[in-house]
Design a protein with these regions (language model features):
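Metal-dependent de-N-acetylase/amidase catalytic core
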Residues: 1-129
Length: 129
């Protein structure tokens, strides 16, 4: 499995540049046998969320897992404290990411699904199969 940021509204354009590089690399190895079985998942960062009708995988997060994710974000120095390219929202990345996943959990709750602290959602990108 490969996970990549599908957040193309990143105000600095970093996520778009990264996904283009990953897709080019995938295209170069498209004939390798393992690639046919590989699942490619896109997640969103802090600027927007997938519409629920696009979601292929939803992963519930417990309160402890939300804290673990926050600590993982802290390990990325470019995402910590004041970001060099925050866009219009001046909050720290982890604050926006937590709000995004908590709002997603509320949407699932309103649909009658189980209630969770947060939900991280992914869209599967089908490349070669």
């Amino acid at each position: 499995q490969i996970y990549a940021a599908g957040d193309l509204s990143d105000p600095h354009g970093t996520h778009r540049t990264c996904i283009e590089a990953v897709l080019e690399a995938m295209n170069q190895i498209r004939d390798e046998a393992w690639i046919k079985e590989c699942r490619f998942w896109l997640y969103r960062g802090a600027w927007q969320e997938w519409d629920l009708d696009m979601v292929d995988m939803a992963v519930p997060l417990s309160p402890d897992e939300v804290i673990q994710k926050r600590h993982a974000i802290y390990r990325h120095l470019s995402q910590k404290d004041v970001m060099p390219f925050p866009g219009e929202d001046k909050r720290e990345f982890w604050q926006r990411a937590e709000e995004r996943t908590q709002n997603t959990a509320r949407l699932y709750d309103r649909l009658g699904m189980a209630e969770y602290q947060a939900i991280e959602v992914f869209v599967r990108l089908r490349l070669f199969n």
